[in-house]
Amino acid sequence: MSVLEESRPFAQQLFNVYFTILSLFCFKLFVKISLAILSHFYIVKGNRKEAARIAAEFYGVTQGQGSWADRSPLHEAASQGRLLALRTLLSQGYNVNAVTIDHITPLHEACLGDHVACARTLLEAGANVNAITIDGVTPLFNACSQGSTSCTELLLEYGAKAQLESCLPSPTHEAASKGHHEFLDLLISWGIDVDQDIPHLGTPLYVACMSQQFHCIWKLLYAGADVQKGKYWDTPLHAAAQQSSTEIVNLLIEFGADINAKNTELLRPVDVATTSSMVERILLQHEATPSSLCQLCRLCIRNYIGRPRLHLIPQLQLPTLLQNFLQYR
């Protein structure tokens, strides 16, 4: 009993120490959150000087280095395409890689507005071509969302990575979903992986099928995209059948899509198609009719050649008619 009584004061002291540390941590967290809300309030009200003062006083961010809490004049000039103002600000020492609270750089803004001249000026001044926002968006992704091939080519020339980690937003998927087939063609020419699989989106081909972007689907298949790879166990043909797109269904089957493939629910494409629809009839017809020998030979030859070498088909010593057949022309 006496041992228990002697241990109580020490336990009480230990509790007080931990409680004090927790209280200080909570207070510090409260101050930071309050400052962030206050800075955001000033930004919304347009009082940039006050927001910059808060950032400089409490976070040590000086003017010209880019406050995380505000858009700099450099951001405004880039977003509005004011090239002369942009050059003037850069000559005055503004940081070309200044970031906002969301880690958006002036280059992000220039690409989002399709201002190629501004983007070139920023890149020549040393802008980070692969800068990532808190949402994982790159300047290349912004250029893609606008379908800007000029900005895209410029960024790629300066070393932009078309594909980063699998969890980040992909320019390829964005182009496929919005139907920017010229942009997609440009990315393919730079050697992207057309089968890049993002867990919550699937492959670019699957995304294009869900969005019913026929020209993008054609570009991806022509570049050698795997017609069976979709999202988890759902194939692109499942997506096309769900969207009731007869043109896309026929195209996928022509490129060798398996009409008997099953998803996680053990459903085939014909099972997910609308009842009595044209898509259902097409799938049932192909189910009852085997592919032609010519079709099977073409698929076999293309698989044997391999995706990295499909562009070399025109160099094969084959009749032009046969080359066109192998290239689906």
Swiss-Prot record:
Residues 278-329 form the SOCS box domain. ANK repeats lie at residues 69-98, 102-131, 135-164, 167-196, 200-229, 232-261. Pfam families: Ank_2, SOCS_box. InterPro entries: Ankyrin-SOCS_box_domain, Ankyrin_rpt, Ankyrin_rpt-contain_sf, ASB5_SOCS, SOCS_box, SOCS_box-like_dom_sf. It comes from the Eukaryota. GO terms for biological process: intracellular signal transduction; positive regulation of protein catabolic process; protein ubiquitination. SUPFAM superfamilies: Ankyrin repeat, SOCS box-like. Keywords: ANK repeat, Repeat, Ubl conjugation pathway. Expressed in endothelial and smooth muscle cells of collateral arteries as well as in satellite cells. Pathway: Protein modification; protein ubiquitination. Induction: Up-regulated in growing collateral arteries. May be a substrate-recognition component of a SCF-like ECS (Elongin-Cullin-SOCS-box protein) E3 ubiquitin-protein ligase complex which mediates the ubiquitination and subsequent proteasomal degradation of target proteins. May play a role in the initiation of arteriogenesis. Belongs to the ankyrin SOCS box (ASB) family. The SOCS box domain mediates the interaction with the Elongin BC complex, an adapter module in different E3 ubiquitin-protein ligase complexes. This is Ankyrin repeat and SOCS box protein 5. It comes from Oryctolagus cuniculus (Rabbit). The lineage of its organism: Eukaryota, Metazoa, Chordata, Craniata, Vertebrata.
